[in-house]
Amino acid sequence: MKKYITSLVFLLTLCSFAFANVDHKTLAIGESAPDFSLPGIDGKTYTLQSFKNAKVLVIVFMCNHCPTSQAYEDRMVKLTSDYAAKGVSLVAINPNNPAGLRLDELGYSDLGDSFEEMKIRAKNMKFNFPYLYDGETEVTANKYGPVATPHIFIFDKDRKLRYNGRIDDMENPAKTPHSLDARNAIDAILAGKEIAVPVTKTFGCSIKWAEKSVWIDKAQIQWAKEPVKLDTLSADGIKEVLKNHTDKLRLVNLWATWCGPCVAEFSDLVTLNHTYRDRGLEFVSISADDPAKKDKALGFLQRKQASGLNYIYTGDDKYKMIEAVDPKWDGALPYTLLVEPDGKIVYAHQGAIDAEELRKIIFDDPMMGRIYKEPVAKP
C-alpha cells in the first residue's frame, strides 16, 4: 500500500487538470480547427485537408510516456474501428517537446516521446489511426491548447469545435466508465443534435512545453547535490546484497575504473537509476578496483553523480568476489544483474549492456510496468 501511495503521489505531481493551465489558450467551442502540417509515423505529412471527407474529425493529443495516455490507447484503437464506417476520422498528435521531459517522468514507460519511439509504440499497440509529431516546434499544440495528455477535440463536418476535454470519466481501463463523453459527443454530431456537455475537465500528464526545460535544469542541479559515498564490502557482504532483503528491484553492476566498457556504460546505468528509482529501482555499484585506489573510484562516481549504493570490494581474492556475485559469471567486467526481492536474478549480463534492452527488461518486470496492467474493459 505504501509503495502504491508513493507512486500515486509522484504521478499526480506530473499530472494536470484542465483548469490548471493558464499559459496556453485552449480552443473554444465553435471555433474553427486550425490547420497543421505534421509528419506521421508512416512517412506521410498530414494537414487538415487530409481528413476533408470525414463527417466528424477527432483530434486527440496523446503521448508515449504518460500512464494516463497509455491507459487510453486501446480505447482509441476501438473508437477508431467502431466509427470508421460512420465517416469519423481520428488522428493522434504528440505535442511533447523532449526538452521539457524529465528522466523521472519516463519511469512509467518503456519508451520516451521522440518521433522514433512513437513508431515503436504504434507498432506495439497496433494503432489504426495516424500518429503525428508536433514536439519539435509545438506550433499545432499552441494553436489547439491541450492542457494534458490525453486531451480530445471533436469537430463537425464544417470543422467547428463541438467538444473538447476528456475521453471518458474512468482512467482505469479495467473499470467501466460512467460517462462516455467522447462517444456521446460523436453520436450527437452524427445525429445532428446538440452535445449535452461540450466541455469537460481533462486529467492527465501536463503538456511538455519547450519552456519547461527549466524542470530538467532543476533536476540536474538537484541530482548534482545528492551525496555520493563509497563503502567497503567483503565477499559475504556481496552475498547479502544479492539476497536483496528489500522491497526494491536491484540493479547491480560490477565495474572498475580501469575497465573501458565499464566506464563507457556507467552513465547509462545512472540514467536508468534516475528514471526508475522513484518506482522502486535501486542501483548498486560494486567496484573491483584495488582498495588502495578507493579515492579514484569515488572521484569517478562523484563525476557521474552516482548517488545510489556504492561499494568497493576489499578482499584480496577476486575469485571469492566472483563466486559471491554469481557462480555462472566468468569474471570479465563489466557484469550487470537485475535482482528481485529475496534474491531472484532475472537478468545477468557479462560485457557492456544494451541500455535500451535493459530499460525494457526493467520496465517489463512485474515490479514495474504500466500502472494499469489489467485487461481493458470494453465500453
Task: Annotate each language-model stretch with its function.
Residues 7-16:
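Bacterial N-terminal signal peptides
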Residues 37-57, 229-250, 270-276, 322-324:
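A short beta-strand-turn-helix
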Residues 38-85:
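N-terminal, post-signal-peptide region of Sec/Tat-exported proteins
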Residues 55-57, 62-65, 248-250, 255-258, ...:
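Short pre-active-site segment immediately N-terminal to redox-active cysteine/selenocysteine motifs
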Residues 63-75, 254-271:
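Conserved redox-active cysteine motifs that mediate thiol-disulfide chemistry
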Residues 87-112, 127-137, 280-294, 306-318:
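Thiol-based oxidoreductase modules, predominantly thioredoxin-like and allied folds used
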Residues 110-149, 153-154, 162, 298-333:
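Short, internal strand/loop/helix patches
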Residues 156-230, 332-379:
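Thiol-/selenol-based redox modules, centered on thioredoxin-like
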